[in-house]
Amino acid sequence: MSGLSHLESEGCRNLLGLLDNDEIMALCDTVTNRLVQPVDRQDAIHAILVYSQNVEELLRRKKVHREVIFKYLAKQGVVVPPTAEKHNLIQYAKDYWAKQSPKLKDTAEPVTKTEDIQLFKQQAKEDKEAEKVDFRRLGEEFCHWFFELLNSQNPFLGPPQDDWGPQHFWHDAKLRFYYNTSEQNTTDYQGAEIVSLRLLSLVKEEFLFLSPNLDSQGLKCASSPHGLVMVGVAGTVHRGNSCLGIFEQIFGLIRSPFVENTWKIKFINLRIIGGSSLAPESVLKPSVTFEPSDLEAFYNVITLCNSPEVRPNVRQIIDSGTGDQVLHSGDEALLNKREMNLLTPLKH
């Protein structure tokens, strides 16, 4: 459910009404990670309000322009300095809604209104639909959102599409980054801030462009009964007009318990292979070199991490990369096996 109060929701609803249709639909895609497909403008506004964690997060969005907040406040009779910056306007709006609360208590209204009933019905429908998640579609929508957002941070492509940052990751997120270009190296990163900054540097400082292959061979997904979703995707790596090689990436996603139908990144394994290490035909349409059952192995291993007798070997398998073998929780032989081979080139 939304983290906005009733007054904040109504205020933001009126404020969003000042945006045009294209801006509303784009904002809905951003807030919901493109996992909600609104049927019309009102449905999109409803989704924006429901899936926003708080009013400040919503109003800070780049698509909610400073001029829109200023115009809304003027319509409400709130006088603010014309030169006020956006963060000040947000505070004016929050203060205005807070002052409306005592007035609301003095007004006798039915406890349950028609729109409340509709909201409850909508939420019940969403909860029921959440039980039947199409993980293939979720993976595809996630990859569209992730790579469009990341690539848009490349300074050669114009202004960024939206805010990139640690808010898209769990606070203890992990990244294992392996590359085989002019040299080979594997580096681990932990924490939402450092993980997001390392990924950002690929496009903002190294000027890379990651182009995912989202057909049946380039994208594979799997899920666990506990809500962990794993997405494997392959694609090509570019800089300007040059194709430098290919990449293979595994995402571990966990649904947020606070915002319905919103997922955050728990871990990423990223492998980039330079073109000199590849057969020419493998660059044309890279494919994921593991099966959904291999993705499930990541979950099986994670659930065993707290077991002292298997922790050392389990940690090796988690930290390795491709999942070339299926791991089952009872497979002692595989648990005792040496670290799986992350450093072998992708299968061609």
Curated annotation (Swiss-Prot):
GO terms for biological process: apoptotic process; positive regulation of apoptotic process. The keyword Amino-acid biosynthesis does not apply. Coiled coil: none annotated. InterPro entries: NTF2-like_dom_sf, UPF_C3orf38. Keywords: Apoptosis. Pfam families: DUF4518. SUPFAM superfamilies: NTF2-like (SSF54427). It comes from the Eukaryota. PANTHER family: DENSE INCISORS. May be involved in apoptosis regulation. This is Uncharacterized protein C3orf38 homolog.
